[in-house]
């Protein structure tokens, strides 16, 4: 039986940056018996022909993450599709992908040690999807009992990671549909003055990818007003 103190999960909320949050989350994932994790935010509302703003926090191999983003795998990955359509977690393995458009993606994932796992939605299905998942290098028929036994801890971990990411991104817990957040306003203000992404990041003390995420969301809010 697992015995992970609740304080370990609360410790995620005091992470000073995404690197520290990744390290602390990975430590918990390993203690749960898995090899790596992925947290994903995708804002589906966007102008035609443009890619949606995407934020990923992960300990998976960077090459796999690049593949996932390059081919927009969140659009057909069964775990991501489930997160977009449901409120409850799901376990996954080869059977989830067999005979689907995502089958080649699963074969790629296997090469990076991602053979089975669980995924947890952390916001209600809407124009923005957010979810957390972890995986291990075992086929589902072997790992399923352990996955099922640890899913309550996984849901708890998903919630804390989601809150920690929102804090670091300076996102409100329930933003108004068309209202800019304070951080979005700051990024837009500097962008209007001609600052580049890296300059905005330096001015605000955040990462360039966080700047891009805020600018992308701000653009989408403007497009639906």
Model-derived regions, located:
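Hydrophobic residues on short alpha-helical segments
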Residues: 188-189, 219
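Short helix-to-turn junction characteristic of helix-turn-helix DNA-binding domains
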Residues: 191-195
């Amino acid at each position: 039986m697992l015995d992970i103190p609740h304080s370990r999960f609360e410790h995620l909320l005091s992470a000073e940056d995404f690197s520290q949050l990744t390290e602390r989350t990975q430590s918990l994932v390993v203690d749960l018996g898995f090899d790596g994790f992925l947290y994903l935010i995708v804002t589906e509302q966007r102008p035609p022909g443009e890619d949606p703003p995407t934020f990923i926090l992960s300990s998976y191999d960077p090459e796999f993450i690049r593949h996932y983003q390059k081919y927009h795998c969140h659009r057909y990955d069964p775990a991501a599709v489930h997160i977009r359509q449901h409120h409850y977690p799901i376990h996954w393995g080869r059977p989830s992908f067999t005979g689907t458009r995502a089958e080649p993606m699963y074969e790629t994932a296997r090469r990076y040690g991602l053979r089975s796992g669980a995924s947890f939605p952390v916001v209600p299905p809407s124009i923005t999807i957010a979810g957390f998942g972890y995986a291990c290098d075992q086929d589902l028929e072997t790992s399923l009992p352990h996955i099922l036994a640890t899913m309550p801890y996984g849901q708890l971990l998903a919630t804390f990671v989601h809150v920690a990411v929102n804090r670091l991104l300076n996102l409100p817990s329930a933003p108004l549909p068309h209202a800019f957040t304070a951080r979005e306003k700051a990024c837009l203000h500097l962008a209007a003055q001609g600052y580049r992404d890296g300059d905005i990041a330096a001015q605000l003390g955040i990462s360039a990818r966080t700047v891009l995420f805020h600018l992308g969301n701000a653009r989408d809010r403007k497009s639906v007003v």
